[in-house]
């Protein structure tokens, strides 16, 4: 099993509230700006897309690649972060 980043652990440790999209694991400044330009400015907006896609890993990773040019690691990290958050809080 792969280890998670500190950013991932910090995100899943508490409710997301109004956290920026850049607080998500796998999403840094560049990807965050690209998502913000498409209206995905908050982590909860990306969570909404994650839920619309029924938490499907492949669909979400494909969407993230299309939305902001995320690479495989970035999309995997973001998916894992949202999945673990959902497991803890939904």
Swiss-Prot record:
Gene symbol of the encoding locus: banf1-b
A GO-annotated cellular component: chromatin
InterPro entries to which the protein is assigned, alphabetical: BAF, BAF_prot, BAF_sf
GO MF term (any one): DNA binding
Protein name, entry field: Barrier-to-autointegration factor B
Task of the protein: Non-specific DNA-binding protein that plays key roles in mitotic nuclear reassembly, chromatin organization, DNA damage response, gene expression and intrinsic immunity against foreign DNA. Contains two non-specific double-stranded DNA (dsDNA)-binding sites which promote DNA cross-bridging. Plays a key role in nuclear membrane reformation at the end of mitosis by driving formation of a single nucleus in a spindle-independent manner.
Keywords, comma-separated and alphabetical: Chromosome, Cytoplasm, DNA-binding, Nucleus
Gene source species: Xenopus laevis (African clawed frog)
Paired cysteines (S-S): none
Family to which this protein belongs: Belongs to the BAF family.
Location(s), subcellular: Nucleus; Chromosome; Nucleus envelope; Cytoplasm
Gene3D superfamilies in alphabetical order: Barrier-to-autointegration factor, BAF
Keyword Nucleus: yes
UniProt keyword Lipoprotein, yes or no: no
GO biological process: chromosome organization; negative regulation of protein ADP-ribosylation; response to oxidative stress
């Amino acid at each position: 099993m792969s280890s998670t980043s500190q950013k991932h652990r910090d995100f899943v440790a508490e409710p997301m509230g109004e956290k920026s999209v850049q607080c998500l694991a796998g999403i840094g400044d560049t990807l965050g700006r690209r998502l913000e330009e498409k209206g995905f400015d908050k982590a909860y907006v990306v969570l909404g897309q994650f839920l619309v896609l029924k938490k499907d890993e492949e669909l979400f990773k494909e969407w993230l690649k299309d939305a902001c040019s995320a690479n495989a690691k970035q999309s995997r990290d973001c998916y894992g972060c949202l999945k673990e958050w959902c497991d803890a809080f939904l």
